[in-house]
Amino acid sequence: MILVFGGTTEGRIAIDTLSEGGKPFYYSTRGEQQKVEEPLVQRITGAMDAPTIEEFCRTHEIRLIIDAAHPFAQELHRNIGVASLSLGIPVIRLERNYPPHAQDITYCSSYEEAVDRMLADGVRHLLALTGTQTIGKLRRFWQQRKTTFRILSRQESLDIACKEGFPEQQLIFYTPEEEEDAPISRIHPDAIITKESGESGGFLEKIEAARRAGLRIYVVVRPPLPPHFHLVEGQHGLYRMVRRYIPDYFPLKRGYTTGTCATVTAKAALMALLYESEEQEVEVALPDGEIITLSIESIERLSPTKARATIRKDAGDDPDVIHGHIIAATVELVAGDELRFLQGEGVGVVTLPGLGLPIGSPAINATPRSTITQELRALYPEGGIDVTISIPDGAALAAKTFNPRLGIVGGLSIIGTSGIVKPFSHEAFVDSLRKECSVAFALSPSRLVMNSGAKSEAYIKALYPQLPPQAFVHYGNFIGDALSIAQEMHFASVSLGIMVGKAVKLAEGNLDTHSKKVVMNKDFLHKVAYEVGTSSDTHALIDELTMARELWGIPSIQERDCLLLALLQRCHSVTASQLSPNTPIVLHLISEGGETILSYPEKI
């Protein structure tokens, strides 16, 4: 088992990451303020000292500890360190991103030092953003100079302030919807003090507000961690470290997007030109800022101004057609100041609108273009750069993808919004669906036709012969996501083809019909059957159902169609509620062989 200490944004990252493993784990917080609904989480609350942590780990066979607690939870970090050393359990510290130190900020190693510096600097009115637990630590200052403390609006915080003897009239309350400038403009301090709480703790917002007001800024730096903690940043860093200590924790292995691979090779090629080096491993930032390191397959200097680097795509356990194939980047320094993306072998050409890319340009999506640009401009801020991404096997592999129906011809796309491939992930599917819908809207804004897959699409296309092929998209199990995208893009109307297995689940209100999330509910089927007055024979058949498609075998065609139409009407109510009243939707229920189709409403 794994024990996580959370209660923070990083705690939620740990929950999301570990849930991918499909195994239960313990999640410890001091209080109950953080709401956690993940079914795999076994929640424990209350402060834990070192002996308590040690006993818990022994009793519950803990193999790994993840410290995702607040950076200033110094006592907890120390207790985790003592217990983990005693038991020989490894500790992963999930760290925040911390901005580099700035010259206009006074950094202090302790609250004592901060008080000394602020008194010496002549601070007259201090806005303290360090929390109620620090009122006592700043006592020496607020007993001499005017101080306003911003605290959480809860009784526990008020009790602490009262216990410390801090004047209640000099308290203000934090509200999430209020901008950081607001308290400054109300009380007019000449300085603020805050903790080095990192980007997820709102540190930058506080600093920028103080800068705009021209205030002195004092920051108490985060305390050191036990030296045996293994520090990681971000979800992927945590994923990799958990795999290191518990190799079988995640059933499926993550990989990297084509966009990440292209970014790494482009950076490696430019480094070869600028530094005349052939780096075997290259660091790049993922779109969320997390730093990762990937191994390069080869680097070649083609001329003093041109170099090429390659990487072998690792998609993990995702069924990616490009897994194991080469992705290359050629970088050339040219005249001018522009960074250009040129057409490369095996990368598709955009031929249809809707993808957010110019027609005729290489199919390199916005996020990879951004990450490549950021990495290259960090090394070479000024001057022209031509970047050519290529996939030697791309043209042949593209035939196995949806690229042709997206209007991308001659090769594959360089894609990826997170930089990481999660096998069979919801995120990847919805991202692909969004691209298909974008092209569909560009070519057919009047109607989007959604189907669960190729089988139902083949049947339903006959109903809409006037529509281009791109107007038909697959929703898989994610009906709710597909409808949200349709609403977001303002299609004039929507048609949804569905087979009876998914229809039974959707009719009950389940917008995600995956078998892991919901199964056929016979009690619900009986309820609908009673409402439409079916015979005892139909109820007996429902009792014996193994698969919902067996409903097509109801002996009475009249009863069958009456029951199925009632289910379809319920499906319509569920789906229509996800769209605006001005966006009509029609549903088509398709039999297993495609020979019978029920529609509701019949016309829109």
Label every PLM stretch briefly:
Residues 27-35, 94-99, 132-134, 152-156, ...:
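Short, polar loop motifs at secondary-structure junctions
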Residues 41-57, 171-182:
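Glycine-rich, highly charged phosphate/nucleotide-binding loops
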Residues 57-114:
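Glycine/small-residue-rich loop that forms an oxyanion/phosphate-binding "nest" at active or ligand-binding sites
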Residues 131-172:
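Anionic-ligand binding region
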